[in-house]
């Protein structure tokens, strides 16, 4: 009797599989079991040129329309259009090796190095390099900030050799997107603090990211125009 009860309990716990309209279900909660589909591994690269070469090399093998999505200022993903099961294959992904310019405060020497190594030279970098080159380390400091300009008479920490009106905003072009496209120029808020040092803060609300995405999309339009016109490649922002 006990053995029959155990057999009954075991049979009740056994999962039964049903085929309904070509789909596979389990009897517990009728959860769909998706079929296994062999998919290619996503290839990761760091440049837009590599994406173009991969698409041209493997387009015929893919056998369907390819979607190029500019996801952000430093990321591009390439995927197929809908397959027969309404899924997509992510084929390639590009991530820019762009250091960018960290927002926040840093020391004078670090600021000098970052302006020379992380930014494309322009009027903004020339102004900042000249300003920083006239700073010294002394024993006291006084500041006057009216919200438009900041005046620093510096004699301690980050210090100036004279009373100078500091521009509150400067235009900089840090390396923030793929090197194959133009680096966007944007406003940065400049702050000088006797204790914290030199501060750079983005001041354009992220508009530069939209410009970077447009530059990336334009790169693909220029380098894969024939495939785009033929409807084989679609570029999205």
Language-model features, listed with the residues they occupy:
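Membrane-active amphipathic alpha-helices enriched in small hydrophobic residues
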Residues: 124-139
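C-terminal assembly and membrane-engagement modules of membrane-active proteins
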Residues: 1-115, 138-237
